[in-house]
């Protein structure tokens, strides 16, 4: 099976030169995804809203790949302020509470100071 590239239409993908996701066989690798609404290229100041939008963006990429959040096997969370991570848990549990992928949280700077969380996932089509 040929490698397939998935785009969200984000200007970041075009400007930087990457794909929102790459499908290789049954594996789907979703790039680090932030809380921007790609239709308007706007981002909320609210951490929970950003977290929710991240996961909506990821779900859209997975659906383009013929998959869903239920197929996520690994997730990495990146927050500039690691102390804020517990605030995200209710939103994360809403999406991953039954899926329970392997997970890691990293505290590191992000590309834009408006970004408060970035999420990267790997999924295996079932």
Language model segments and positions:
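Short, polar/acidic, helix-capping and beta-turn segments at strand->helix junctions
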Residues: 1-126
């Amino acid at each position: 099976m040929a490698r397939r590239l998935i785009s969200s239409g984000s200007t970041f993908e075009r400007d930087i030169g990457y794909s929102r996701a790459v499908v290789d066989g049954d594996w789907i690798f979703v790039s680090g995804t932030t809380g921007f609404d790609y239709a308007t290229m706007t981002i909320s100041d609210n951490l929970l809203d950003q977290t929710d939008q991240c996961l909506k963006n990821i779900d859209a990429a997975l659906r383009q790949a013929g998959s869903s959040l239920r197929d996520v096997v690994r997730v990495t969370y990146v927050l500039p302020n690691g102390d804020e991570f517990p605030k995200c848990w209710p939103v994360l549990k809403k999406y991953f509470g039954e899926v329970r992928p392997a997970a890691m949280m990293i505290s590191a700077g992000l590309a834009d100071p408006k970004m408060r969380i970035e999420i990267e996932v790997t999924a295996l089509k079932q």
